[in-house]
Amino acid sequence: MLVNEGIRAREVRLVGANGDQIGVKSKHEALEMAQRVNLDLVCVAPNAKPPVCRIMDYGKYRYEQQKKEKEARKNQKVITIKEVRLSPTIEANDFNTKLRNARKFLEKGDKVKASIRFRGRAITHSQIGRDVLERLAKECEDIATIEARPKMEGRSMFLVMAPKTEK
């Protein structure tokens, strides 16, 4: 952001402190007008012909901009993907533990990637793994939507669920 002497243009379109159009003035005149009211001359549109400059308190303006950026960062939600690993021959209690973890992640607002790794000859029975993932998805369907249906990648099968958004 160009301020006061940092402005290189000879002529500028000047906007007053309260937002009124003053007109096209020389840079020197605009600087004098800003200094008379103890404010800064700030170039708000440097690419315009002639550049648009405004008389304002630059310190206050920068503070407001930083406050807006901080507020915007605070309101951003970072979505992370949590992984729950299962096996095709998972027992009931182990499945319930994994289900509880998946539901906890979804309720927190994170996406869940459920994966099954097939070891050895278990890959020949990939339907068993698909059934386990489908069962997990069915148990979570009240709080989650399925983003990616179960699919094989190498020796693993994946399912991605995202939390349902409230409207």
Swiss-Prot record:
Q: Which domain of life is it from?
A: Bacteria
The biological processes this protein is annotated with in GO are: ribosome disassembly
First-listed, main subcellular location of the protein, grouped into a coarse class: cytoplasm
Which UniProt keywords are present, listed alphabetically? Answer: Cytoplasm, Initiation factor, Protein biosynthesis
Provide the protein's localization.
Cytoplasm
Q: Which GO terms describe its cellular component?
A: cytosol; membrane
Family annotation (InterPro entries): T_IF-3_C_sf, T_IF-3_N_sf, Translation_initiation_fac3_CS, Translation_initiation_fac_3, Translation_initiation_fac_3_C, Translation_initiation_fac_3_N
Protein function: IF-3 binds to the 30S ribosomal subunit and shifts the equilibrium between 70S ribosomes and their 50S and 30S subunits in favor of the free subunits, thus enhancing the availability of 30S subunits on which protein synthesis initiation begins.
Q: Which PANTHER family match?
A: TRANSLATION INITIATION FACTOR IF-3, TRANSLATION INITIATION FACTOR IF-3, MITOCHONDRIAL
Q: How does it assemble?
A: Monomer.
Report the sequence similarity comment from the record.
Belongs to the IF-3 family.
This chain's protein is named: Translation initiation factor IF-3
Q: What is the lineage of its organism?
A: Bacteria, Bacillati, Bacillota, Bacilli, Bacillales
